[in-house]
Swiss-Prot record:
InterPro entries: Ribosomal_uL5 (IPR002132), Ribosomal_uL5_arc (IPR022804), Ribosomal_uL5_C (IPR031309), Ribosomal_uL5_dom_sf (IPR022803), Ribosomal_uL5_N (IPR031310). This is one of the proteins that bind and probably mediate the attachment of the 5S RNA into the large ribosomal subunit, where it forms part of the central protuberance. In the 70S ribosome it contacts protein S13 of the 30S subunit (bridge B1b), connecting the 2 subunits; this bridge is implicated in subunit movement. May contact the P site tRNA; the 5S rRNA and some of its associated proteins might help stabilize positioning of ribosome-bound tRNAs. HAMAP family: Ribosomal_uL5_A. This is Large ribosomal subunit protein uL5. GO terms for molecular function: rRNA binding; structural constituent of ribosome; tRNA binding. One of its GO terms (cellular component) is ribonucleoprotein complex. NCBIfam families: PRK04219.1. Keywords: Ribonucleoprotein, Ribosomal protein, RNA-binding, rRNA-binding, tRNA-binding. It comes from Methanoregula boonei (strain DSM 21154 / JCM 14090 / 6A8). SUPFAM superfamilies: RL5-like (SSF55282). Belongs to the universal ribosomal protein uL5 family. Part of the 50S ribosomal subunit; contacts the 5S rRNA and probably tRNA. Forms a bridge to the 30S subunit in the 70S ribosome.
Length: 165
């Protein structure tokens, strides 16, 4: 009941513009994650970057279950199983980035496509979180049942042999 597990992994690529570059990023993400990405849109207009509100500027995929665990293992190997303590939030979630998609197995550099980086966000939880999400008789999650930063670090060290600096 107190064991920490991965709820979901969100992989995000921010391209900054729509068009051909975004389509290339979507194809790369589909190859890496084996799922179809959805487009993320700009929340506000940024005239300095020629970005309009509502314009598609990136893509993302949410992974759960076994695919999420496999993706995390591969991603942590790419960053040499090292995560900094500042990459954790107070709820035990953590995020890290990968600078080049070519680091993934089976991916190679193509001058027609270029190089894309990605952000990986991992949400950790314990069993019993359903009481906050269910439709009837919602309740607040007890403090002892919440995942804390220290719990997340211990989970990563135990399950994935990650070094936290």
């Amino acid at each position: 009941m107190r064991d920490v597990h991965i709820d979901k992994v969100v992989v995000h690529m921010g391209v900054g513009e729509s068009g051909e570059k975004l389509v290339k990023a979507e194809n790369i993400m589909k190859t890496i994650t084996k799922q179809t990405p959805i487009r993320s849109v700009a929340k506000m207009t940024q005239p300095a970057f020629n970005i309009r509100k509502g314009a598609p500027i990136g893509c993302k995929v949410t992974l759960r279950g076994k695919p999420a665990e496999d993706f995390i293992k591969t991603s942590l190997n790419i960053v040499n199983k090292t995560i900094f303590e500042s990459q954790f939030d107070k709820s035990g979630n953590f995020s890290f980035g990968i600078e080049e998609h070519t680091d993934f197995p089976g991916m190679s550099y193509d001058p027609q496509i270029g190089i894309f980086g990605m952000d990986i966000n991992v949400v950790l939880e314990r069993n019993g979180i359903r009481i906050t999400r269910r439709r009837m008789q919602k309740k607040k999650l007890p403090e002892k049942q919440r995942v804390k930063k220290e719990d997340a670090i211990a989970f990563l060290k135990k399950e994935y042999s990650v070094e936290v600096r």
